[in-house]
Design a protein with these regions (language model features):
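Short hydrophobic/aromatic beta-strand element in the GNAT-like acyltransferase core
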Residues: 50-52, 84, 118-120
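Exposed loop/turn and edge beta-strand positions of beta-sandwich/beta-sheet ligand-binding modules
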Residues: 47, 79, 115
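Short, solvent-exposed aromatic-acidic interface loops
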Residues: 70-74, 135
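Core segments of cupin and vicinal oxygen chelate
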Residues: 2, 12-61
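Short amphipathic alpha-helices within nucleic acid-binding modules
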Residues: 21-24, 90-96
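A short beta-turn/loop motif at secondary-structure boundaries
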Residues: 40-45, 73-75, 110-113
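Eukaryotic phosphotyrosine signaling hubs
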Residues: 8-9, 78-82
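Vicinal oxygen chelate
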Residues: 2-4, 9-13, 94-137
Length: 137
């Protein structure tokens, strides 16, 4: 492995209500709760709660998405990150987004030069997601 390579990737989304957002991401994207952590944020000394989500049932070094709540900070209002998800059925995912309190931003569109169909949406707290389905070759 190269010195700058990494074995896995995790993303932390700062949220207002980690439980509500956990329910949303599990229902829409099929993720599972693999761990819950709370306490003081290490060297920062701030109270926090987080729920770690993954595609498996345990922390196995794979990719995770963490719903992270700083308990004493003002809640985020601006877009800090765009979460990207790849799916086999973008139309079905669109229905799940709406059914679970998300908001669709425009119609599904094709970017044939990139070989994808794309749908932008917001989760119930307004975080932006880019949802992609690969086009058949």
């Amino acid at each position: 492995m190269a010195d700058n390579a990494f074995a896995s990737l995790f993303t932390k989304l700062i949220v207002d209500d980690e439980e509500k957002m956990t329910d949303y991401y599990c229902a829409v994207y099929g993720l599972n709760v693999v761990a819950r952590v709370g306490g003081d944020a290490g060297g920062m000394g701030e109270p926090f709660r987080e729920v770690i989500l993954g595609t498996g049932e345990a922390m196995d070094g794979g990719q995770t998405l963490v719903m992270f709540n700083f308990l004493d900070r003002p809640k985020p209002r601006d877009q800090q990150v765009i979460l990207g998800f790849v799916t086999d059925d973008l139309d079905a995912l669109k229905a799940k987004i709406v059914a679970n309190g998300g908001k669709v931003l425009g119609d599904i569109f094709e970017q044939t030069d990139h070989g994808v169909r794309v749908l932008f949406a917001e989760d119930p707290e307004g975080a932006l997601t880019e949802n992609v389905q690969m086009l058949a070759h």
